[in-house]
């Protein structure tokens, strides 16, 4: 489950 990185990329 890769959600942390997904959220970080979205925030960036």
Curated annotation (Swiss-Prot):
It comes from the Bacteria. This is Unknown protein CP 39 from 2D-PAGE. On the 2D-gel the determined pI of this unknown protein is: 5.4, its MW is: 29.5 kDa. The lineage of its organism: Bacteria, Bacillati, Bacillota, Clostridia, Eubacteriales. It comes from Clostridium pasteurianum.
């Amino acid at each position: 489950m890769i959600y942390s990185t997904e959220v970080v990329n979205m925030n960036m």
